[in-house]
């Protein structure tokens, strides 16, 4: 995650519009209540907090990005493979353009499933070296209800 530490000050300038576009697409398709709890795995600077009008939490391994995210929502430093939350703690779990960075993506998917109660949005970078393997892992771990093609990602809406 050294790359993200190095670009942390310019992260939003580089990725804001792209990430907000994905987040808007996710919000349009995922029905949520103000009482719902949303977990953003690989939250970066916490852009998801700008759109979801409910309880939000973020987790990311990069300390420098979390320094920005914690101004927007509660955060924890950690990896997707070892989420520091209780089982079934979140109504919605999102993981946008992060899965390809996991050391063990399958374990990360199982962790998301463990802490979620049934609504998931996971995007996979189309140019990820392991794209096909990641798609298979998501399909094996979750029931994919809808697939949306974004310019750079495939967004999977799962149960």
PLM ranges: what are they?
Residues 129-141, 154-155:
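Short alpha-helix
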Residues 1-31:
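Conserved class I S-adenosyl-L-methionine
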Residues 118-126:
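Conserved beta-strand signature within the Rossmann-like core of class I S-adenosyl-L-methionine
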Residues 97-98:
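Short catalytic micro-motifs in class I SAM-dependent methyltransferases
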Residues 39-82:
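Class I SAM-dependent methyltransferase SAM/SAH-binding core
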Residues 149-159:
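Core SAM-dependent methyltransferase catalytic element
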Residues 94:
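A conserved beta-strand element that flanks and buttresses the S-adenosyl-L-methionine
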Residues 106-119:
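A short glycine-rich, Lys/Arg-flanked "PGG" loop and its adjoining helix->strand segment in the class I
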């Amino acid at each position: 995650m050294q790359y993200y530490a190095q670009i942390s000050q310019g992260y939003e300038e580089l990725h804001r519009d792209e990430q907000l576009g994905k987040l808007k697409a996710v919000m349009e398709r995922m029905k949520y209540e103000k009482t719902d709890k949303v977990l953003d795995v690989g939250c970066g600077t916490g852009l998801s907090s700008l759109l979801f009008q409910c309880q939000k939490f973020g987790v990311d391994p990069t300390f420098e990005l979390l320094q920005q995210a914690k101004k927007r929502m509660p955060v924890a430093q950690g990896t997707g493979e070892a989420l520091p939350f209780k089982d079934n703690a979140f109504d919605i779990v999102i993981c946008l353009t992060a899965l390809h960075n996991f050391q063990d993506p399958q374990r990360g998917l199982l962790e998301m499933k463990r802490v979620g109660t049934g609504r998931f949005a996971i995007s996979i970078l189309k140019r990820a070296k392991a794209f096909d393997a990641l798609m298979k892992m998501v399909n094996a771990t979750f029931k994919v209800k809808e697939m949306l093609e974004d310019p750079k990602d495939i967004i999977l809406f799962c149960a």
